């Protein structure tokens, strides 16, 4: 849905979507830490592809940043317009990185960097501490809902992988219970959350498997109307309560997964009510 959203936007918003959100935010967190993990695990073809792609992305980032500056320099009235696009496309790109988070923490046989560490380095230090310091000259502030993203760095990968594990029959992902070494690594990297919230889930699942009964969730998950990711995320500041936002448009109710996605939906409801949600289509028999 990310690219459908970008391609159906105007040309200048498209520049922000691709040059900022995709080339800068998303690919930094995919092609650098995950491809380093591929290299560390001996997957040289993936590493070669990833680092080659990232060299292209570096040039694209430069182009995207200059395009943003050009728009801002033309007229002061452009600042709130560009700011709103940055707010929107930051959150759209960030939600896509949820898959990268669980890939780093759970799917690499040998771990090289946690999602939390990658997020702190490539987003908090380099983007918030670098890019947005430059853009502050033009009146641009850090994206709306950035605090929600920072608060999720301790829990994001665990929530996503646990959901994929339960819906492996639908997602066609190979998922397994992390072994003792992997769980100890997660405990060391997520000292505030893993042992308290997620190790008990895996301990319980290990007992299920020993008894011959790995569990799956029967049925399919509710999808967010905007990002189309399953509604698996939790309330900001409360990792034990699922986050679900409801908006009404033309008498019909629509569900979103977060404050960010609800804000995006309510800015352009006439666009997002048209979303083609796979789970809805499956239940309709299409």
Predicted regions, residues:
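Non-heme di-metal
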Residues: 1-223, 230, 237
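Soluble, non-membrane globular domain cores that form compact, hydrophobic packing
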Residues: 218, 227, 245, 281-285
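Residues immediately within or flanking Cys/His clusters that coordinate Zn2+
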Residues: 221-224, 244, 251-254
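Cys/His-coordinated zinc-binding microdomains
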Residues: 228, 258
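Short recognition patches in nucleic-acid-associated and regulatory proteins
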Residues: 230-248
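Cys/His-rich microdomains that often coordinate metals
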Residues: 231, 261, 265
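Short, intrinsically disordered terminal segments enriched in charged and Pro/Gly residues
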Residues: 265, 273-281, 285
């Amino acid at each position: 849905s990310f690219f459908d959203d970008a391609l159906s936007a105007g040309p200048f918003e498209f520049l922000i979507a691709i040059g900022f959100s995709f080339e800068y935010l998303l690919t930094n967190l995919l092609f650098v830490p995950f491809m380093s993990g591929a290299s560390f695990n001996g997957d040289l073809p993936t590493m070669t592809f990833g680092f080659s792609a990232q060299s292209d992305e570096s040039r694209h980032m430069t182009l995207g940043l200059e395009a943003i500056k050009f728009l801002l320099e033309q007229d002061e009235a452009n600042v709130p317009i560009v700011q709103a696009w940055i707010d929107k496309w930051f959150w759209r790109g960030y939600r896509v990185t949820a898959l990268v988070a669980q890939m780093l923490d759970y799917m690499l046989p040998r771990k090289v960097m946690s999602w939390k560490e990658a997020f702190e380095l490539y987003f908090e230090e380099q983007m918030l501490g670098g890019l947005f310091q430059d853009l502050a000259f033009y009146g641009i502030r850090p994206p709306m809902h950035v605090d929600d993203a920072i608060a999720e760095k301790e829990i994001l990968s665990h929530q996503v992988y646990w959901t994929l594990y339960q819906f492996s029959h639908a997602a066609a992902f190979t998922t397994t219970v992390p072994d003792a070494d992997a769980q100890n690594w997660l405990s060391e990297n997520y000292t505030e959350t893993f042992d308290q919230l997620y190790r008990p889930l895996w301990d319980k699942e290990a007992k299920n498997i020993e008894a011959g009964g790995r569990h799956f969730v029967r049925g399919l998950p509710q999808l967010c109307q905007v990002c189309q990711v399953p509604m698996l995320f939790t309330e900001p500041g409360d990792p034990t309560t699922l986050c679900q936002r409801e908006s009404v448009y033309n008498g019909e109710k629509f569900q979103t997964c977060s404050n960010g996605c609800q804000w995006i939906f309510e800015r352009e409801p006439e666009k997002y009510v048209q979303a083609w949600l796979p789970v809805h289509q499956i239940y309709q028999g299409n």
